[in-house]
C-alpha cells in the first residue's frame, strides 16, 4: 500500500496560485479506495480525485491554492480493506531503518517560500 506525489517534484519551482498535486497510488493485494493529500505536514487530510478506480493502481490529482508560504505536502492512500498507508515513523518502528525494499511510508515534500521543492523526512 503506497502513494507518491510525482508532481510537483524535485527541481520544480512553483509560483503562487493554483498548483496541481498529482501522483500514483497502488496496493499489492486489493483496490485503492481513496487517496488523501495533506498540505500542512499531515495535520489534516483532504480527498484527492482518483482515476482508474476499478484496479489496484490509480492516478490522483488535487488542486492546491498555494499562497507562497513554506509548507509540507504529502499523500496517503486507503485500500478497500480500510488499511491506511503508514507514516515513515510507523514503518521504521515496525521494520527498522534499513527497510528500503518494502518501504511504503508516507513521502514528504517541502515547498519553500521561494517555490523550490525539497524532499524531506518527517
Label every model-predicted segment:
Residues 2-122:
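Long, low-complexity serine/threonine/glycine- and acidic-rich segments characteristic of extracellular
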Amino acid at each position: 500500500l503506497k502513494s507518491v506525489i510525482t508532481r510537483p517534484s524535485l527541481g520544480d519551482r512553483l509560483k503562487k496560485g493554483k498548483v496541481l498535486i498529482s501522483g500514483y497510488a497502488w496496493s499489492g493485494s486489493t483496490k485503492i479506495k481513496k487517496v488523501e493529500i495533506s498540505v500542512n505536514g499531515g495535520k489534516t487530510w483532504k480527498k484527492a480525485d482518483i482515476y482508474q478506480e476499478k484496479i489496484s493502481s490509480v492516478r490522483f490529482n488535487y488542486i492546491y491554492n498555494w499562497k507562497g508560504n513554506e509548507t509540507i505536502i504529502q499523500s496517503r492512500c486507503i485500500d478497500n480493506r480500510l488499511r491506511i498507508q503508514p507514516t515513515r515513523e510507523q514503518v521504521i518502528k515496525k521494520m527498522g531503518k534499513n527497510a528500503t525494499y518494502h518501504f511504503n511510508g508516507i513521502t514528504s515534500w517541502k515547498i519553500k517560500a521561494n517555490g523550490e521543492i525539497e524532499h524531506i523526512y518527517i
